[in-house]
Swiss-Prot record:
This is Bifunctional purine biosynthesis protein PurH. SUPFAM superfamilies: Cytidine deaminase-like (SSF53927), Methylglyoxal synthase-like (SSF52335). GO terms for biological process: 'de novo' IMP biosynthetic process. One of its GO terms (molecular function) is phosphoribosylaminoimidazolecarboxamide formyltransferase activity. The gene is purH. It comes from Bacillus cereus (strain 03BB102).
Amino acid sequence: MKKRALVSVSDKTGVVEFVKGLLEQGIEVISTGGTKKLLEENGLQVIGISEVTGFPEIMDGRVKTLHPNIHGGLLAVRDNETHVAQMNELGMEPIDFVIVNLYPFKETIAKPDVTFADAIENIDIGGPTMIRSAAKNHKFVSVIVDPVDYDVVLAELKENGEVKEETKRKLAAKVFRHTAAYDALISNYLTEQMGEESPETLTVTFEKKQDLRYGENPHQKATFYKAPFTVTSSVAYAEQLHGKELSYNNINDADAALSIVKEFTEPAVVAVKHMNPCGVGVGTDIHEAYTRAYEADPVSIFGGIIAANREIDKATAEKLHEIFLEIIIAPSFSKEALEVLQSKKNLRLLTVNIEKATSASKKLTSVQGGLLVQEEDTLSLDESTISIPTKREPSEQEWKDLKLAWKVVKHVKSNAIVLAKDDMTIGVGAGQMNRVGSAKIAITQAGEKAQGSALASDAFFPMPDTVEEAAKAGITAIIQPGGSIRDEDSIKVADTYGIAMVFTGVRHFKH
């Protein structure tokens, strides 16, 4: 019996050449709608779906393949005598190949002017039903949903006269990944439209961007996936202009650097190592900002990741060229800057839009046996809700330093302490199990610069010891959430040493 293929695709990439190959192998081709028209325009002989079903396409194409003659031909187990007898009795013929991809739902809802009705109309029903039927019966049916697989199937047909069982199984697995991702997009769109924030089930879908050489360590395998919709201000959708492929650790560090630099509207540069900032500087231009970020910690910046929120110019590029860096991220690079930096063949240069995340963005964190979902921490300092419990208020310069330190401390691993002075960080204490330990690290790093600086803490002081350490170092202003049952003890110490302290009422833990 002559083999048959059913072809109905929205992505018509390579389909004409593929169908030519099928016809050359003596395979009969059934097709529908626009696909049939395209194939016939290219001189290919195909059978209309209505000739198989004996029923016209109706309801604007909503009903065309949902028919027993189609699904019987797909689902029949060819070595089951009962199935074969029923097919013969009902005049059905088997379908051996299904080449289908689905209505462009993702592309439709990505349009800024999409209406709800447009989105609903682009939910495919017949396509998923066909490819699921074919994939279930993959022992007998080859199902192709991705044009990238056309050459593999044709090569095996030419060599063996049939598709290998292993290939059929791989194609079937791909089908169910394809339909799962498709349904996830639909369910997430409808869930968002209804404003449901915590649905009873959560289905997420990501698309493979690249295999990575290894994960956090060489013995760990890793892959990088991207969100299905373009997130312009992200590492996943950044454009790499130069350098080696990104590694797992590169991606994590670049993401951290990008998150911090988004906090600033003035020219700013952030240096990151192991997902913690080692230096942050702001200035009247990007060169001045970089100089301050470098001076914040000229030791730790070596081998680090740099993020800037302005174009990198030649003067800044020449300074960056002087040290070893893994990555530089910026909205753009001047032509002269690129010439300077591209002389380092391994230095990765990325361009990305710098846009602050919104609270609607979700952060996913995997735990053993589960997944945590929360809003991104995008809350900025609200000066209308702060309080100053100390006798002295911050000076104008102290306010500048406090604000800078507060923007940075929310991005430092808890327990987190950041010291800032004169438009730059001068000390960062990260990830300690007690708060005073982080304070001591930041103060030690700052050295003499701590005198007259501002301190930010990501959470309240459970005891006054951190304020005492700050006073010893000559720190003159502190910003922290407040809310401890022992706040009065910290306030008393601050007043004793003339330290101005600000309560924000907002905690910024980061784990």
